[in-house]
Amino acid sequence: SPYFLYRMLRRGGYGFKLYYRIGLFPIIPKKTDNKRIWIQAVSVGELSSLAKILDTLLQDPDLEIVLTGTTSTGLRMASDKYKGRVLVHGPFPLDWFWFSRLAWSRVRPDLIITVDSELWPEHFYQASLRGVPALIINARLSDNTFARLCRSSLARKLLLPKGLEILTTSERQCARWSEV
């Protein structure tokens, strides 16, 4: 909602590269035969948990990585560690239809990856519209989110599209995701 946009700008840090947040990613090189992976790691914690996987992916010359984040500290870490190694890095677009659709038209990924407990309904919707596989790595459900998803089939439908692949961190989390 406009309220959250206002809060982001007022709070500081989140207004950094606002054009990314409204889907206006910079000119991204034309799509080649290489596979393009869009990785969304919200903050320093998610980016750190993804480091080994990301470093391995970056060694493959047939892959192009678009790396996005949400927090100012996560974006700073992404810039410090991956600038020049990924195709593009910057803020994740706000999860609203127009912004997401615009970002997707520019990024054109072959796979999307999110980390931990981040559920981005519009991002996942855009993936399903385009037949792009979506993957959550280190997937976790808090007690509250688990309870809400168990109670609401609408929430499950909006947040968990068909074909979403989920890699969990424990047997308990695996059981929770399976139940949902």
Regions found by a protein language model. Name each.
Residues 5-27, 31-180:
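Active-site and donor-binding regions of nucleotide-sugar-utilizing enzymes
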